[in-house]
């Protein structure tokens, strides 16, 4: 067993993400029995001493049958209606499954906006931490009834990566109908090569990922992107089939493992890099790009050539090179109107109260 798999096997805390396809029959019907089986595997891991938070998809799928729908809805309003009905069935199923072991579950509904706003981000963290302290099993799902774009992409893959860092988890396990990463879709390509471990970009050379299924929205592209996000933040990831949940959660002997970076990213830098929504963008000249990206220095107004969006001091902004390609993200020290009058000017030309960096090096994260 590699050190990367061993890190997941010995993790004292983890997030387990359960995809929609892991909770439905081949015909697309929500299956509480499948959910109970996954709860058994998760319970075994918790009984061994690991603290587990569950990110569960499946609300929309669970709402299809009660509403008399013939298939997963495609329009947003019906998706949200199905989610509102299905979320009840989903949480009740998790509650019943863990009640067999004397455990209580708590429901936490989040949206991308909740994670992106610093105050809500902190509140979500406190809630999850308190649930764990009270020995309740947190069941996290995207708040589909109010989500817009987020409801259509990701199937909670990205949310699970964000939650893993949010709660300080030592591992993330993604369970779906896919048994790992291949260089192409094994269901369509004969001889598709299985990739057991991803330690760097070279392991992904030539990988062709596909879109999501009809029932879920998170295809291999979403899973791979989310796994890389978590790994870059310092959380090792295991991508495995729900059918192999027992092995995945016991000894991490199945699936594809994504190695984590050696040093875990701080909570603030992670929020700036991945969680926060950029309120605007600053275009930099070549000298400023070198200073920010390669020398890890603060961004001064002199290196800014353009300002876009409407933002305020304390917001996160995207930093772009002359070619408009994003090079970093950071917390800006001025609002849009102030910075528009300061850009391109040296610090010595500015009044004393405007001589702070536009973005301090401590608040910068290269992308």
From Swiss-Prot:
EC number: 2.7.2.11
Record's keyword terms, sorted: Amino-acid biosynthesis, ATP-binding, Cytoplasm, Kinase, Nucleotide-binding, Proline biosynthesis, Transferase
Sample GO molecular function, one term: ATP binding
Pfam families associated with the record: AA_kinase (PF00696), PUA (PF01472)
Residues holding substrate: 57, 144, 156
InterPro entries the record matches: AceGlu_kinase-like_sf (IPR036393), Asp/Glu/Uridylate_kinase (IPR001048), G5K_ProB (IPR041739), Glu/AcGlu_kinase (IPR001057), Glu_5kinase (IPR011529), Glu_5kinase/COase_Synthase (IPR005715), Glutamate_5-kinase_CS (IPR019797), PUA (IPR002478)
GO biological process: L-proline biosynthetic process
Chain sites annotated for binding ATP: 17, 176-177, 217-223
Main location: cytoplasm
Physiological role: Catalyzes the transfer of a phosphate group to glutamate to form L-glutamate 5-phosphate.
Family: Belongs to the glutamate 5-kinase family.
PANTHER family: GLUTAMATE 5-KINASE (PTHR43654), ISOPENTENYL PHOSPHATE KINASE (PTHR43654:SF1)
Stated name of the protein: Glutamate 5-kinase
Species: Mycolicibacterium paratuberculosis (strain ATCC BAA-968 / K-10) (Mycobacterium paratuberculosis)
């Amino acid at each position: 067993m590699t050190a990367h798999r061993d890190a997941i096997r010995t993790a004292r805390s983890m997030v387990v993400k359960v995809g929609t396809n892991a909770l439905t029959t081949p015909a697309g019907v929500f299956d509480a029995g499948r959910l109970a089986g996954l709860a058994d595997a998760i319970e075994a891991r918790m009984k061994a001493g690991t603290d587990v938070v569950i990110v569960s998809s499946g609300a929309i799928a669970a709402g299809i049958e009660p509403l008399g729908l013939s298939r997963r809805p495609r329009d947003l309003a019906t998706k949200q209606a199905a989610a509102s009905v299905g979320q009840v069935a989903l949480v009740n199923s998790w509650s019943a499954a863990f009640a067999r072991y004397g455990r209580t579950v708590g429901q936490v509904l989040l949206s991308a906006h909740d994670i992106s706003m610093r105050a809500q981000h902190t509140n979500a963290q406190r809630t999850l931490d308190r649930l764990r302290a009270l020995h309740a099993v947190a069941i996290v799902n995207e708040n589909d009834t109010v989500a817009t774009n987020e409801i259509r992409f990701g199937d909670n893959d990205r949310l699970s990566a964000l939650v893993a860092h949010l709660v300080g988890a030592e591992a993330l396990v993604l369970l779906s109908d896919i048994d790992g990463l291949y260089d192409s879709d094994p269901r369509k390509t004969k001889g598709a090569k299985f990739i057991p471990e991803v330690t760097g970009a070279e392991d992904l050379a030539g990988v062709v990922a596909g879109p999501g299924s009809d029932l879920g929205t998170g295809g291999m592209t979403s899973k791979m992107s989310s796994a890389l996000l978590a790994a870059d933040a310092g959380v090792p990831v295991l991508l495995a089939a729900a059918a192999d949940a027992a092995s995945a959660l016991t000894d991490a002997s199945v699936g594809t493992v994504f190695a984590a970076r050696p040093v875990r990213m701080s909570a603030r830098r992670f929020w700036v890099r991945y969680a926060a929504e950029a309120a605007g963008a600053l275009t930099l000249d070549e000298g400023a790009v070198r200073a920010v990206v390669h020398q890890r220095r603060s961004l001064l107004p002199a290196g800014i050539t353009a300002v876009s969006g409407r933002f305020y001091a304390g917001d996160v902004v995207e930093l772009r090179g002359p070619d408009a390609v994003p090079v970093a993200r950071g917390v800006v020290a001025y609002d849009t109107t102030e910075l528009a009058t300061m850009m391109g000017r040296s610090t010595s030309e500015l009044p004393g109260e405007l001589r702070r960096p536009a973005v301090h090096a401590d608040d910068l994260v290269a992308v």
